């Protein structure tokens, strides 16, 4: 009787232990093949955050109104960096648009009100081959006959000036590095002022058109 009792007990214990092992193995397999079920946290994939395109802009406060320029740092990185450097240093403050031609462009950034040239930094490489065109409302670097001679002076086109665009290395063009996004009507007004010859330079406004300040700002 005793031996049968222990035999039955051992059988019951064996069955219980086997059942527990099966259950444990089942749990482990479920957790290993479905790691996200336990907490639910890993099942939620994070959406990639949208990268905001921040454009650098410069506001020219002039004696005839404000002009806001959006800079194309992607197409003209060297030129934009150069322009921002001058603006942040206050170089353009109290300079003038010293060359104004109606139906063509306005040029400034290098002379004081009394027509004295400011000493610039070293010249930069010409980025005119960047695909940007000298269309109405664009800003580009002025230079001498040497393509890589641009320093501080710039011009804003009042009309499409295709003849200023890059064609090939032998016709290198003028480097566009931004466009007017506000105040093009101010540019148009500036082109209507009376001009004269001063200090050997033609097309100088009789009444100075002053760049009071050039401030770097950013917009989305």
PLM regions with names:
Residues 2-220:
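Cyclophilin-like peptidyl-prolyl cis-trans isomerases
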């Amino acid at each position: 009787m005793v031996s049968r009792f222990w035999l039955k007990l051992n059988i019951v214990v064996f069955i219980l232990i086997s059942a527990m092992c099966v259950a444990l193995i089942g749990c482990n397999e479920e957790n290993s093949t479905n790691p996200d079920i336990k907490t639910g946290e890993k099942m939620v994939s994070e959406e990639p955050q949208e990268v905001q395109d921040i454009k650098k802009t410069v506001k020219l406060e002039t004696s005839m109104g404000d002009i806001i320029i959006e800079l194309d740092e992607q197409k003209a990185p060297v030129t934009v960096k150069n322009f921002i450097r001058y603006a942040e240093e206050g170089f353009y403050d109290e300079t003038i648009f010293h060359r104004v031609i109606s139906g063509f462009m306005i040029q400034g950034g290098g002379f004081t009100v009394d027509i004295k040239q400011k000493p610039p930094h070293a010249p930069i490489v010409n980025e005119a081959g960047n695909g940007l065109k000298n269309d109405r409302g664009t800003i580009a670097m002025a230079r001498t006959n040497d393509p890589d001679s641009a320093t501080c002076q710039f011009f804003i086109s009042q009309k499409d000036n295709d003849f200023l665009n890059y064609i090939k290395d032998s016709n290198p063009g003028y480097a566009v590095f931004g466009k007017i996004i506000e105040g093009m009507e101010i540019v148009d007004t500036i082109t209507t002022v009376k001009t004269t010859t001063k200090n050997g330079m033609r097309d100088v406004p009789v009444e100075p058109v002053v760049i009071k300040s050039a401030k770097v700002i950013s917009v989305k």
